[in-house]
Amino acid sequence: NHLTTSLGITAQYFTLNKNWTVEPRAALKWTFNPKHALALAYGLHSRRERLDYYFVEQEVNGKTESNRYLNFSKAHHFGLTYDWNINSYMHLKVEPYYQYLFRIPVEENSSFSIINHQSFYLERILKNRGSGVNYGIDITLEQYMKNGFYYMITASLFKSRYKAGDHIWRNTRLDKNYLLNVLAGKEWMVGRNKQNVLSLNGRIFFQGGDRYTPVD
Protein backbone atom coordinates (compact mmCIF):
# COMPACT_ATOMS: atom_id res chain seq x y z
CA ASN A 1 0.00 0.00 0.00
CA HIS A 2 1.95 3.03 -1.22
CA LEU A 3 1.73 6.26 -3.21
CA THR A 4 3.97 7.27 -6.10
CA THR A 5 4.09 10.84 -7.39
CA SER A 6 5.60 12.16 -10.60
CA LEU A 7 5.96 15.86 -11.38
CA GLY A 8 7.37 17.49 -14.46
CA ILE A 9 7.43 20.58 -16.58
CA THR A 10 8.32 21.26 -20.19
CA ALA A 11 8.62 24.44 -22.23
CA GLN A 12 8.60 25.44 -25.90
CA TYR A 13 9.73 28.59 -27.67
CA PHE A 14 8.90 29.32 -31.32
CA THR A 15 11.50 31.66 -32.78
CA LEU A 16 9.41 32.61 -35.83
CA ASN A 17 6.82 34.58 -33.85
CA LYS A 18 8.42 34.52 -30.38
CA ASN A 19 5.53 32.61 -28.80
CA TRP A 20 6.38 30.42 -25.83
CA THR A 21 4.60 28.02 -23.53
CA VAL A 22 5.22 26.27 -20.20
CA GLU A 23 3.46 22.95 -19.62
CA PRO A 24 3.14 21.33 -16.17
CA ARG A 25 2.58 17.58 -15.83
CA ALA A 26 1.64 15.55 -12.73
CA ALA A 27 0.71 11.95 -11.92
CA LEU A 28 -0.27 10.17 -8.72
CA LYS A 29 -0.38 6.36 -8.41
CA TRP A 30 -1.89 4.51 -5.46
CA THR A 31 -1.05 0.82 -5.19
CA PHE A 32 -3.57 -0.21 -2.55
CA ASN A 33 -3.18 -3.97 -3.07
CA PRO A 34 -0.51 -6.16 -4.72
CA LYS A 35 -2.99 -6.75 -7.54
CA HIS A 36 -4.75 -3.39 -7.74
CA ALA A 37 -3.64 0.17 -8.46
CA LEU A 38 -5.24 3.51 -9.29
CA ALA A 39 -3.49 6.38 -11.06
CA LEU A 40 -4.55 9.96 -11.75
CA ALA A 41 -2.72 12.14 -14.26
CA TYR A 42 -2.91 15.69 -15.57
CA GLY A 43 -0.93 17.46 -18.25
CA LEU A 44 -1.04 20.69 -20.21
CA HIS A 45 0.00 19.99 -23.80
CA SER A 46 0.79 22.42 -26.62
CA ARG A 47 1.17 21.93 -30.36
CA ARG A 48 2.81 23.99 -33.06
CA GLU A 49 1.23 23.74 -36.51
CA ARG A 50 3.06 22.91 -39.72
CA LEU A 51 5.57 25.59 -40.63
CA ASP A 52 4.04 26.45 -44.01
CA TYR A 53 0.75 27.39 -42.31
CA TYR A 54 2.46 30.40 -40.71
CA PHE A 55 3.40 31.89 -44.08
CA VAL A 56 -0.11 32.03 -45.53
CA GLU A 57 -1.10 35.61 -46.44
CA GLN A 58 -4.30 37.06 -47.86
CA GLU A 59 -5.72 40.47 -48.70
CA VAL A 60 -8.74 41.12 -46.45
CA ASN A 61 -10.65 44.42 -46.79
CA GLY A 62 -7.62 46.10 -48.31
CA LYS A 63 -5.30 44.90 -45.56
CA THR A 64 -2.79 42.04 -45.67
CA GLU A 65 -3.38 39.41 -42.99
CA SER A 66 -1.24 36.38 -42.26
CA ASN A 67 -0.96 33.39 -39.93
CA ARG A 68 2.52 34.37 -38.78
CA TYR A 69 1.48 35.08 -35.20
CA LEU A 70 -0.67 32.02 -34.59
CA ASN A 71 -0.17 30.80 -31.04
CA PHE A 72 0.29 27.22 -29.87
CA SER A 73 -2.82 25.05 -29.74
CA LYS A 74 -3.32 23.89 -26.14
CA ALA A 75 -5.09 21.08 -24.32
CA HIS A 76 -5.74 20.08 -20.72
CA HIS A 77 -5.45 16.28 -20.41
CA PHE A 78 -7.02 14.43 -17.46
CA GLY A 79 -6.75 10.66 -17.09
CA LEU A 80 -7.66 7.98 -14.56
CA THR A 81 -6.22 4.45 -14.74
CA TYR A 82 -7.26 1.29 -12.92
CA ASP A 83 -4.84 -1.66 -13.11
CA TRP A 84 -5.81 -5.17 -12.03
CA ASN A 85 -3.33 -8.03 -12.16
CA ILE A 86 -5.95 -10.78 -12.18
CA ASN A 87 -3.32 -13.49 -11.83
CA SER A 88 0.24 -14.14 -12.95
CA TYR A 89 -0.74 -14.18 -16.64
CA MET A 90 -3.84 -11.98 -16.96
CA HIS A 91 -4.10 -8.20 -16.72
CA LEU A 92 -6.98 -5.72 -17.00
CA LYS A 93 -6.57 -1.97 -17.49
CA VAL A 94 -9.42 0.58 -17.56
CA GLU A 95 -8.64 4.19 -18.53
CA PRO A 96 -11.31 6.91 -18.67
CA TYR A 97 -10.05 10.30 -19.90
CA TYR A 98 -11.10 13.85 -20.69
CA GLN A 99 -9.32 16.42 -22.87
CA TYR A 100 -10.26 20.07 -23.26
CA LEU A 101 -8.69 21.75 -26.30
CA PHE A 102 -8.42 25.54 -26.58
CA ARG A 103 -6.70 28.22 -28.65
CA ILE A 104 -7.39 26.01 -31.66
CA PRO A 105 -6.78 27.77 -35.02
CA VAL A 106 -10.11 28.36 -36.80
CA GLU A 107 -11.40 30.54 -39.62
CA GLU A 108 -13.70 33.34 -38.48
CA ASN A 109 -17.43 32.92 -39.23
CA SER A 110 -16.80 29.47 -40.70
CA SER A 111 -17.09 25.80 -39.72
CA PHE A 112 -13.38 25.27 -40.52
CA SER A 113 -11.07 24.15 -37.70
CA ILE A 114 -7.48 22.94 -37.94
CA ILE A 115 -8.65 19.87 -35.98
CA ASN A 116 -10.34 18.54 -39.13
CA HIS A 117 -7.80 19.71 -41.69
CA GLN A 118 -6.32 16.88 -43.77
CA SER A 119 -5.35 18.52 -47.07
CA PHE A 120 -1.70 19.15 -47.88
CA TYR A 121 -2.25 22.87 -48.54
CA LEU A 122 -3.81 25.55 -46.39
CA GLU A 123 -5.02 28.87 -47.84
CA ARG A 124 -7.04 30.29 -44.95
CA ILE A 125 -6.38 33.02 -42.41
CA LEU A 126 -6.77 31.52 -38.95
CA LYS A 127 -7.28 32.80 -35.42
CA ASN A 128 -6.71 30.97 -32.10
CA ARG A 129 -10.40 31.16 -31.12
CA GLY A 130 -11.57 27.56 -31.46
CA SER A 131 -11.99 24.82 -28.89
CA GLY A 132 -12.80 21.15 -28.62
CA VAL A 133 -13.36 18.21 -26.28
CA ASN A 134 -12.38 14.55 -26.38
CA TYR A 135 -13.59 12.10 -23.77
CA GLY A 136 -14.01 8.37 -23.49
CA ILE A 137 -12.78 5.14 -21.95
CA ASP A 138 -10.15 2.60 -23.03
CA ILE A 139 -10.29 -1.01 -21.81
CA THR A 140 -7.54 -3.60 -22.27
CA LEU A 141 -7.75 -7.26 -21.25
CA GLU A 142 -4.57 -9.24 -21.84
CA GLN A 143 -3.44 -12.80 -21.28
CA TYR A 144 0.29 -13.33 -21.52
CA MET A 145 1.60 -16.53 -23.08
CA LYS A 146 0.33 -19.55 -21.12
CA ASN A 147 0.32 -23.11 -22.43
CA GLY A 148 1.18 -21.66 -25.81
CA PHE A 149 -1.88 -19.39 -25.94
CA TYR A 150 -2.17 -15.60 -25.65
CA TYR A 151 -4.68 -12.88 -26.46
CA MET A 152 -5.24 -9.15 -26.10
CA ILE A 153 -8.60 -7.40 -26.37
CA THR A 154 -8.73 -3.61 -26.52
CA ALA A 155 -11.90 -1.55 -26.74
CA SER A 156 -12.53 2.19 -26.81
CA LEU A 157 -15.70 4.23 -26.53
CA PHE A 158 -15.22 7.94 -27.12
CA LYS A 159 -16.63 11.25 -28.30
CA SER A 160 -14.81 14.06 -30.11
CA ARG A 161 -16.34 17.50 -30.74
CA TYR A 162 -15.13 20.95 -31.74
CA LYS A 163 -16.30 24.55 -31.89
CA ALA A 164 -15.16 26.60 -34.89
CA GLY A 165 -15.28 30.30 -35.77
CA ASP A 166 -19.07 30.26 -36.15
CA HIS A 167 -19.42 29.21 -32.46
CA ILE A 168 -21.33 26.00 -33.30
CA TRP A 169 -20.37 22.66 -31.74
CA ARG A 170 -19.95 19.77 -34.20
CA ASN A 171 -18.52 16.25 -34.27
CA THR A 172 -14.90 16.13 -35.44
CA ARG A 173 -13.85 14.19 -38.51
CA LEU A 174 -12.30 11.50 -36.30
CA ASP A 175 -15.33 11.02 -34.05
CA LYS A 176 -15.60 7.28 -34.77
CA ASN A 177 -17.38 6.56 -31.44
CA TYR A 178 -15.91 3.08 -30.97
CA LEU A 179 -12.89 0.87 -31.65
CA LEU A 180 -12.50 -2.86 -30.97
CA ASN A 181 -9.33 -4.86 -31.54
CA VAL A 182 -8.93 -8.59 -30.80
CA LEU A 183 -5.54 -10.25 -31.17
CA ALA A 184 -4.94 -13.92 -30.32
CA GLY A 185 -2.50 -16.70 -31.08
CA LYS A 186 -1.51 -20.25 -30.30
CA GLU A 187 1.92 -21.90 -30.48
CA TRP A 188 2.80 -25.58 -30.65
CA MET A 189 6.22 -27.12 -30.16
CA VAL A 190 6.76 -29.57 -33.00
CA GLY A 191 9.50 -31.75 -34.43
CA ARG A 192 11.31 -34.79 -33.15
CA ASN A 193 12.94 -32.89 -30.27
CA LYS A 194 10.18 -30.29 -29.86
CA GLN A 195 12.58 -27.53 -30.88
CA ASN A 196 10.48 -26.03 -33.67
CA VAL A 197 7.48 -23.74 -33.25
CA LEU A 198 4.27 -23.82 -35.24
CA SER A 199 2.12 -20.77 -34.57
CA LEU A 200 -1.32 -19.57 -35.60
CA ASN A 201 -2.21 -15.89 -35.04
CA GLY A 202 -5.17 -13.75 -35.94
CA ARG A 203 -6.51 -10.23 -35.54
CA ILE A 204 -10.01 -8.76 -35.82
CA PHE A 205 -10.52 -4.98 -35.90
CA PHE A 206 -13.74 -2.95 -35.88
CA GLN A 207 -14.17 0.82 -35.81
CA GLY A 208 -16.73 3.47 -36.57
CA GLY A 209 -16.40 5.47 -39.78
CA ASP A 210 -14.90 8.92 -40.32
CA ARG A 211 -17.30 11.85 -40.27
CA TYR A 212 -17.78 13.79 -43.51
CA THR A 213 -19.95 16.53 -44.94
CA PRO A 214 -22.26 15.21 -47.69
CA VAL A 215 -22.11 16.91 -51.08
CA ASP A 216 -25.50 18.38 -52.04
Region annotations inferred by a language model:
Residues 1, 32, 45, 67-68, ...:
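Feature marks flexible
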Residues 1, 16-20, 69-74, 129-133, ...:
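Short sequence motifs at beta-strands and strand-loop junctions characteristic
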Residues 1, 7-9, 22-26, 38, ...:
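Hydrophobic, lipid-facing positions within transmembrane beta-strands of outer-membrane proteins
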Residues 1-15, 21-25, 35-78, 98-124, 141-143, 147-159, 203-216:
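Surface-exposed extracellular loop regions of Gram-negative outer-membrane beta-barrel proteins
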Residues 2-5, 35-38, 88-92, 147-151, ...:
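Repeated loop/turn-to-beta-strand initiation elements of outer-membrane beta-barrel proteins
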Residues 9-11, 19-35, 84, 154, ...:
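Transmembrane beta-barrel strand/turn architecture of Gram-negative outer membrane proteins
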Residues 98-100, 121-210:
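Gram-negative outer-membrane beta-barrel transporters
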